[in-house]
């Protein structure tokens, strides 16, 4: 996983050891054998969402036991299983630096060879969708008010584009491996989102509802959204309110403390913060002002800047703002460290009806490779 808070790391200066990494442990002793970090000082929620594949790679006539790790960034890291060293060279490349006060982003990020980068990783006016003249014009007008550029653009006070978005690239589904051909099959989403940061410090007096709103924005909006859900499987704020309205307060607080399903626990929250977050979700506590000095805050005081959430970036008709393909399936030759082929994955029937070729779609799932040479995948959304 990544270090918290996801989008501001001024209280965790440095690379953040063991976050965003592949970790090899000796199963007999529990001792660390090696680790390899794929993102330094993550402020993009670019955690490793899926386990690596155990693979073999042939180099100079020798078979090497290795692992292949897909990522949300669309980087494939291929590492020697014994040593953790990259089989194909990884370069530390300078990336843009944060302008948020107190934040110290790491100056470089690890990039595998371009032949092992299988996602779109840049969004400027040059990459804008050409689906219709009206859509292109609207997107470009929006972009002129935003930070744009290459991957690892840090969140700032101004809206910043993120491509791949926070769900990838590759997400939970992972990859499939053909051990005969030594080929890895990995699907990928190519859709942009945007993010910005706001000051989080509560005023001297604040209602329980408003304090809960600030906490929700920092802790919950990235999955549950402000209105619509951001992550598949996470109920939207609207749906969440309908569910929680019928639940005892103690039950809601138990979920905050212990987590449930895919939701992690938020045991760091003080009792005051739990009550405020519950009040916001239940839409009460708007009238009574709380004295800031009397509140016990463990989280709200620690994070001076919070994200506005993982915000969808669509054209006026609801389609992705960047050029297709918006979803792909790639076959990667692990001996050569390069993409054999890349196919468009998914389609919008309404766009096909207009005469457009399949564009691909956002996808959440993984492929299966068979011994008979077939690859099966659903995953499209």
What are these regions (language model features)?
Residues 1-208, 273-381:
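Beta-sheet-rich non-transmembrane sensory/scaffold domains
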């Amino acid at each position: 996983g990544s270090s918290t808070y996801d989008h501001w790391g001024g209280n965790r200066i440095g690379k953040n050891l063991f976050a965003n990494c592949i970790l090899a442990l000796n199963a007999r002793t529990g001792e660390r054998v090696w680790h390899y970090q794929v993102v330094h000082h993550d402020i993009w929620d670019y955690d490793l969402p899926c386990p690596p594949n155990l693979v073999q790679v042939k180099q100079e006539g020798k078979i090497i036991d290795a692992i292949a790790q897909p990522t949300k960034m669309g980087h494939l890291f291929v590492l020697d299983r014994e040593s953790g060293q990259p089989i194909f060279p990884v370069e530390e490349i300078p990336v843009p630096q944060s302008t948020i006060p107190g934040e110290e982003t790491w100056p470089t990020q690890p990039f595998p060879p371009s032949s092992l980068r299988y996602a779109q990783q840049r969004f400027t006016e040059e990459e804008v969708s050409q689906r219709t003249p009206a859509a292109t014009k609207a997107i470009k007008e929006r972009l002129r008010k935003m930070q744009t550029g290459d991957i690892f653009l840090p969140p700032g006070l101004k809206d910043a584009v993120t491509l791949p978005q926070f769900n990838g690239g590759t997400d939970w589904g992972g990859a499939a491996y053909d051990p005969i051909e030594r080929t890895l099959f990995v699907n990928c989403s190519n859709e942009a989102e945007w993010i910005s940061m706001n000051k989080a410090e509560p005023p001297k007096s604040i209602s329980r509802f408003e304090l809960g709103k600030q906490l929700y924005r920092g802790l919950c909006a990235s999955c549950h959204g402000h209105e619509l859900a951001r992550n598949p499987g996470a109920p939207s704020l609207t749906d969440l309110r309908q569910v929680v309205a019928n639940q005892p307060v103690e039950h809601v607080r138990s979920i905050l403390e212990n987590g449930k399903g895919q939701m992690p626990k938020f045991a760091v929250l003080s009792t005051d913060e739990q009550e405020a977050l519950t009040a916001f979700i239940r839409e009460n506590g708007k009238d009574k002002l709380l004295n800031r000095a009397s509140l016990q805050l463990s989280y709200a005081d620690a994070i001076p800047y919070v994200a506005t959430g993982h915000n969808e970036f669509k054209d006026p008709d609801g389609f992705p703002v960047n050029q297709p393909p918006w979803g792909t399936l790639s076959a990667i030759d692990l001996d050569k460290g390069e993409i054999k082929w890349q196919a468009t994955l998914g389609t919008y029937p309404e766009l096909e009806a207009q005469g457009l070729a399949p564009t691909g779609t956002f996808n959440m799932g993984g492929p299966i490779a068979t011994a008979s040479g077939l690859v099966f995948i659903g995953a499209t959304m």
